[in-house]
């Protein structure tokens, strides 16, 4: 899975889109460069016994391995993210009552809320464990990666209306990687493009945040993240939409167990420590060991 760094922590929020304000993030994070593919889900199912179902896209261009994973509910996307974490030794992002292989397990089951007694509890976001490496992007994380441009306004930074670095609608295409293009305005039967062929990039070099398939946000409709059964945000539009639905003005909400051929998702993560940080930590550790031995 390829990630792009999203920097410029503490950027100002946008006050022209939906919701208002949106897009201000006070920390560095990474955004998946591409949407999650069918192949990624199938491999995780085989190894992790996740039981995530994908919609049959035969009537929408086919079930190619590199097509986006569609028909995945928010709850199933959260299961996939948890598997990414636990399979690599990290803390799961989301809390479920039952795990794969246990009696009572269902990939469609709602999460439960992390409690103050749980390591990694974050009162500002009771959905996500702060010790997890991988997670679904929050509303602000998704919005920033799509619409914010640190070089806009003479380097001051600012927001575009579309996730291709422009206030003008992108050129509608069936696929490709040309700048200023997006996969939208296509016949329904065509279906989405492969995840690596899903149009031009955002200012942060992320592909397909406008068109191709709608993407789940981590964040619930009222932005609070304290109700497991509440509707979650989706945004970005799909291959058959008009350009307006790709814009920063549009955010819609669906039940977390909803599965639809138009819905997919991408993954975000925390960055690995930089070499400079690791060198600093190593130097501090060496100094402390020398101090204890002296």
Model regions and ranges:
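A short, hydrophobic C-terminal helix/tail in secreted or cell-surface proteins
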Residues: 272-289
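Short, structured beta-strand segments at or near domain termini in extracellular proteins/domains
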Residues: 260-269
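Functional-site microenvironments in short loops/helix caps that host divalent-cation chemistry
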Residues: 76-247
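A short glycine-rich, aromatic-capped structural motif
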Residues: 1-55, 68-85, 211
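Short, conserved phosphate/pyrophosphate- and ester-handling motifs at nucleotide-, phospho-/glycolipid
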Residues: 37, 138, 272
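Short proline/glycine-enriched turn/loop segments at secondary-structure junctions
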Residues: 223-224, 252-259
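Short, charged juxtamembrane terminal tails flanking transmembrane helices
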Residues: 291-294
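Residue-level detector of conserved, well-ordered beta-strand and adjacent loop positions
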Residues: 7, 14, 32, 63, ...
